Amino acid sequence: MKSSTREQTPVTSPTPHDPTPPTPPRGSTPLFSRGSWLETRRITDVLRKETIGGALLLLGTVVALVWANSPWSSSYAGLRDTVIAPSLLHPLHLDLTLGQWAADGLLAIFFFIAGLELKREFVAGDLRDPRRALVPVAAAVGGMAVPAVVYVLVARSAGDGALNGWAIPTATDIAFAVAVLAVISTHLPTALRTFLLTLAVVDDLLAITIIAIFYTDTLAVLPLLGALAVIAVFGLLVQKRIRSWWLLIPLAVVAWALMHASGIHATVAGVLLGFTVPVLRSRAAGGPEAGPGMAEHFEHVWRPLSAGFAVPVFAFFSAGVTVGGLSGLVDSLQDRVALGIVAGLVVGKAAGILGATAAVSRFTRARLDPSLSWWDVLGASLLGGIGFTVSLLIGELAFGAGSVRDEHVKVGVLTGSLLAAALAAVVLRARNRVYRRLHEAERVDEDADGVPDVYQAPRLNG
């Protein structure tokens, strides 16, 4: 009798008190679906660490800005420009300042994590399924291409190599973005958080590709071949499941140093090293069901160092621009390079990510998840306009660290990122009541098995 009654109950659209979305049309692929419970737990853990890292990044940025605009600004510049160069390292061109060590050395750890994340996404995450990968990949490409075009349109009349900075507004800083989410205290749905993290991973790949191809002035072949050989040895060892840090860390350092000597930015070595690490457990170790693989293990070990130290220290040494008060800020923003960066981050990023997502929805069978609206996509797209770490790095490569134009780049990146964050906060806060209902629905576990019911729906319906 119960079964008959259940079959006659009509399916209705969600009401304000029923946040469970209706089932998408058969044959369509939902955009921004929440994914599996295991993937959601992993992403939640990653974003929790990135939130702490984002807070430290903001702290490093604020300290640098205050110090650089204080009466003691010369001491900040002196610290940043202090050369740490043992004579043994001179043949490898490693006579670097503290600021350069942060950009070339510490950020290699950040890009090593990016390499691990990217490989994991392609092997065991959302990107392994072409249908699920289509949206974040298209959004990342749109979020790179449109800001670059906007920058070129704004800055093309500036001259003096202004177009060298076309890639500056193409990057997204996930740590900064999740720090903004923490500040505005919004219950962003799991599906959007997953999209943001996956977008940032693909974004990092595009950024490092741009750096390697477009910002390499000279190329020394022998050091490059040496770096690739050492990376191959590193890869062989990790494929054999060797985890001895006393062996792997020296190899990674040698690969980094040789990559730096080759003329290619040393952070590229970090990504390539990350790509070599296996994601899944071997059959001898019990297979994928036995637990996380080596890539996830390495990520757990190194992410706190990346998010909690490497990126904040880089921000401290890179964000310290002497603004000179309101008049100095206005003067900096009169440079069309700075204006192009602001326009690229605020307008270009949002238009590129939102437009690419809409195009996927328009020209494929993919449809927006019923629990979300296009306002949510706009909010996530605006968050994508928070470009900081990689944007500052590309600015230094494009115009030279410490140059006048590099100072204007810093002002543009800071201004554009703050504007994008403010606009995202307005849009997402307006939807926070909806997000809170979705968040509560995603926590319901009526059968008390430790897995929220929404993640069991496909199995139960089957």
Curated annotation (Swiss-Prot):
It catalyses: Na(+)(in) + 2 H(+)(out) = Na(+)(out) + 2 H(+)(in). Gene3D superfamilies: Na+/H+ antiporter like domain (1.20.1530.10). It is found in: Cell membrane. GO terms for biological process: regulation of pH. Residues 1-31 are annotated as: Disordered. Keywords: Antiport, Cell membrane, Ion transport, Membrane, Sodium, Sodium transport, Transmembrane, Transmembrane helix, Transport. It is a multi-pass membrane protein. It comes from the Bacteria. One of its GO terms (molecular function) is sodium:proton antiporter activity. Disulfide bonds: none annotated. The keyword Membrane applies. Residues 16-27 have a biased composition (Pro residues). It holds the Pfam family Na_H_antiport_1. GO terms for cellular component: plasma membrane. The chain crosses the membrane at residues 52-72, 96-116, 134-154, 165-185, 195-215, 218-238, 244-264, 309-329, 337-357, 382-402, 408-428. Belongs to the NhaA Na(+)/H(+) (TC 2.A.33) antiporter family. NCBIfam families: NhaA (TIGR00773). Na(+)/H(+) antiporter that extrudes sodium in exchange for external protons. This is Na(+)/H(+) antiporter NhaA 2. It comes from Kineococcus radiotolerans (strain ATCC BAA-149 / DSM 14245 / SRS30216). The gene is nhaA2.
